[in-house]
Amino acid sequence: MTKYYLAVDIGASSGRLILGHLENGKMVLEEVHRFENGMVKKDGELCWEFDRLFVEIKDGLKKCKELGKIPVSMGVDTWGVDYVLLDEAGQVLGNTVGYRDHRTEGMDEEVYK
């Protein structure tokens, strides 16, 4: 039975889900889902659409199921500078503010003072 591995790559302008499996000792890759991405203004801040990104990942997982290629593992790669805070129940607290938001303007100069 073939083992499939899923990579979720979310970038600043697009995201994609790639399935991989070994064939004759080599990794074979297949893009199963691609979507546009970008920040939107929310409450005066530039934010990632967290809920929509989650839906896109689920859509990619559904596509894997439709193809009959269920991954045995999954890895997610996103930006190294953004984060969300979660409460005890795993719910997002506040907006998912992005690194390009105005709130960080001038901070690089402050670091070197």
Each predicted region: which residue ranges?
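N-terminal glycine/serine-rich phosphate-binding loop of ATP-dependent small-molecule kinases
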Residues: 1-95, 105-106
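Glycine-rich phosphate-binding loop plus the immediately following alpha-helix
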Residues: 100-113
